Amino acid sequence: MDFAANIPKHHSLDHLARPLVTVDDVLISHKNGQYAILLIQRRNEPFESCWAIPGGFILENEPPDCAAVRKLTSETNLKGISLMPIGVFGDQNRDPRGWMITMAYCAIVDQTAVNAFAGDDAADAKWFDLKWEKSGNDMSLSLTHDELVLRALLRKQEVTTSLGPNIRFDQLENYGIAFDHAKIIATAIERMIDFQDT
């Protein structure tokens, strides 16, 4: 039976906004008390030559978790990484091309056990030393690779949703990190690392 043919016109979805949907992957390495994060350098606009976490668009009929694995593999050549969802990000100004909603994933790995190199639309892939400091609700991020330093300052907000308490970050400053990826990185730290340390 063709259920779509029986939908009344007043139930059509044509009048609703349709954001594009993406996935983003945060890969963090932890060894001897030191943290590192895998970033790719963007080959194309927007944010050409800036550094970002791996990710991209979900294909039609593709489950988000499969898209996350596909984009991680295509941009960094890493396979067999088990990713955990950490949040959904949908601020309307997060991408200059239009309204994008992203589902973010994270994995803690040993960078010495994986061999990442750039592929697809990534110009480069590098591990950056990852450091953060907290002062009240503010978190400062520092990502360094040799002489290259990326920084961001974020403010954490605790919000109550219909599903219970949640956190979100507002980006106060950003130097060199594409899109809203500093917010996603801060969320990964809060959910994956600080949670494990408590």
Predicted features along the sequence, with ranges:
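Unchanged
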Residues: I58-S82, G87-D197
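N-terminal strand-loop-strand
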Residues: A4-I53, D65, G80
